[in-house]
Amino acid sequence: MMKSRFCPSPTGLMHLGNARTALFNYLFAKSKDGIFLLRIEDTDVERSKETFDLGLKEDLRWLNLEWQEGPGADEGNGPYHQSKRQAIYDDYYQRLEEADQAYPCFCSEEQLRLSRKIQRSAGKPPRYAGTCRSLSAAEIEKKKAEGLQPALRFRVPDDEVVVFADLVRGEQRFQTNDIGDFIIRRANGTSPFMFCNAIDDALMGVSHVLRGEDHLTNTPRQLLILQALELPVPTYAHIALIVGPDGSPLSKRHGSRGIKELRDNGYLPLALTNYLARLGHYYASDELLSLAELAKGFNVESLSKSPAKFNAQQLDYWQKQTVNQLPNDDFWEWAGSELQSQIPTDKADLFLTTVKPNASFPRDVAYWVNVCFGKTLNLETAQSELLRATGNRYFEEAFEAFKKFGKDLNSVVSHLKEKLNLKGKPLYQPLRIALTGAEHGPELAKLILIMDYETIQNRLQEACQ
């Protein structure tokens, strides 16, 4: 059975890049009637925190990316926290050492740094020089007796080529002479990502590894490990990373925010999944799609090799589409029941049909609740200056027109046009700003029907001051 996986490290909050990787793996699994697995890679003991672990799971559930295997689900291949799997890794270290495919390395960080510096100055790529590769058993025991704690290095075969087919990038070839022997166990006994990640994928039956292109150079090393241990090898696919509009790595200065922050600001999960699913993946449909529909249209061959540029406006577009299709009860649950309670029952339906198409966030709903039912508007300086420049006569005539025609906006506007000889923006804009405090928004005629007549009068009088 096809099985994909998402393997976050609980060293921080989930960001858009993490979320997209999780989403693609989820959609990939669902498109093949496969299994989506969650594994927590918490081998970085100092930086891994339980709060981040819980936060990652909460974010995944909020995005409706439910895993079928992993913590709290099917745990048949567990444990699913790497910090609890050290005995498993130790067993495979022993196998590699016994087969002479791994050896202890006593080189200090300073020695390694100097070696890399010499290699770079000679125009060579930095790789391990093999200082400890041929130590005899006696030399190894002597160094251990001196109290030196060795790391463990994988013995990379010379003069070979590692070849694999990447589902996104096609055939990939790596010369083993360019790789060099690499560390698979640190001197303190802990396991680095590269080793335990490969072991766990094999033991947990992961058939497809879909991850960021920043892991591409890890793949030949992991293939060498798996082949040496005669473990099953998954199929790999390396997706392009998300970058800012300027092509630089995505950061907060581009408007990128963590999933928790987006959720707290009122973004909806379906908006996020519709945006992220199209960020580096082509969909023929430009309509809002359910997760099931996104999965049905997902194809690894439709993943782009080029970096995916983050666009905050596109994210907000999908947010607006999602809000617009919310059932009324869900809309109020999202916007807040305290806002709903401020709306008279007899005006609730009209308010909803008027405001909903113009709302992207709960703060938008709160704004229009205040416009329709609040006492005062907080005008910006430029708006106040525009009202002053319009002159009192405009608002006096508007006041009289509302008295004469009631809430018939067309008649009010015709009256102003006739009395003041105005047209276009000078005719409409001052009235909209005086009544709503905004230059754009829902249809003014409908907003006027929602407002109390007294509110309309008061705002026109305030505009005259």
Swiss-Prot record:
A motif ('HIGH' region) lies at residues 8-18. GO terms for molecular function: ATP binding; glutamate-tRNA ligase activity; tRNA binding; zinc ion binding. It catalyses: tRNA(Glu) + L-glutamate + ATP = L-glutamyl-tRNA(Glu) + AMP + diphosphate. SUPFAM superfamilies: An anticodon-binding domain of class I aminoacyl-tRNA synthetases, Nucleotidylyl transferase. It is found in: Cytoplasm. It comes from the Bacteria. Its main location: cytoplasm. A motif ('KMSKS' region) lies at residues 249-253. ATP binds at K252. Pfam families: Anticodon_2, tRNA-synt_1c. Its EC number is 6.1.1.17. GO terms for biological process: glutamyl-tRNA aminoacylation. It is an enzyme of class 6 (ligase). Belongs to the class-I aminoacyl-tRNA synthetase family. Glutamate--tRNA ligase type 1 subfamily. Catalyzes the attachment of glutamate to tRNA(Glu) in a two-step reaction: glutamate is first activated by ATP to form Glu-AMP and then transferred to the acceptor end of tRNA(Glu). PANTHER family: GLUTAMATE--TRNA LIGASE (PTHR43311), GLUTAMATE--TRNA LIGASE, MITOCHONDRIAL-RELATED (PTHR43311:SF2). Monomer. This is Glutamate--tRNA ligase 1. It comes from Coxiella burnetii (strain Dugway 5J108-111). The lineage of its organism: Bacteria, Pseudomonadati, Pseudomonadota, Gammaproteobacteria, Legionellales.
